[in-house]
Amino acid sequence: MSRAILVMGESGSGKTTALRTLDPTTTFIIDADRKGLSWRGWRKSYNSANKNYFQTSSVPKITEVLNRIDKGDLQHIKTVVIDTLNMCMTDDEMNRMREKTFDKWADLAWSIWGILTNIHLYRDDLTVVCMAHSQTDRDENGYMFTRMKTSGRKLDKLVPEA
């Protein structure tokens, strides 16, 4: 059973910058934000030629990459980073914004839930790090709590940080 780590923080708090300390020979970064990494010279270490960097926010493509790392030709990879889950949600929501049915919200919830629940099914020596933006809310009793920022109320019920 692989390990899952959720790293949450406000935008600009250093989540992506912290990745510079990871070993590029055993780390694969899925750049869902498609903005590149935030430190100088990152392209020397993370690129398609090194087979350790891929830009997509498509959940089916992310799942395909994770399956390839798990059982395919990338067995040397020990750490996978998805940066960020929020962009996966936002892109799916925007791509389907003209749809008027409730189904799109159920599909979005299922796709993100699918990533989060399947992480534990990968090989034992694999760690999957999901990066996400955080949101701080107050409940009806005035207690403050921080959770993963989500798109839509259906996804608010997901509690991956628990």
Segments (PLM) and residue ranges:
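Glycine-rich phosphate-binding loop used to anchor ATP phosphates in small-molecule kinases
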Residues: 76-87, 108-139
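Oxyanion-hole/transition-state-stabilizing segment in secreted/luminal serine hydrolases
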Residues: 78-102
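Conserved P-loop
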Residues: 1-81, 87
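Short, glycine/charged-enriched secondary-structure capping and boundary segments
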Residues: 21-22, 42-45, 94-97, 142-146
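Switch/connector loops and helix/strand junctions flanking conserved nucleotide-binding motifs
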Residues: 37-40, 88-92, 137-144
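Substrate-gripping "pore-loop 1 plus following alpha2 helix"
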Residues: 95-117, 144-153
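Alpha-helical scaffold elements adjacent to nucleotide-binding pockets in ATP/GTP-utilizing enzyme cores
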Residues: 65, 115-118, 157, 161
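Phosphate-binding/switch region of NTP-binding enzymes
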Residues: 122, 127-162
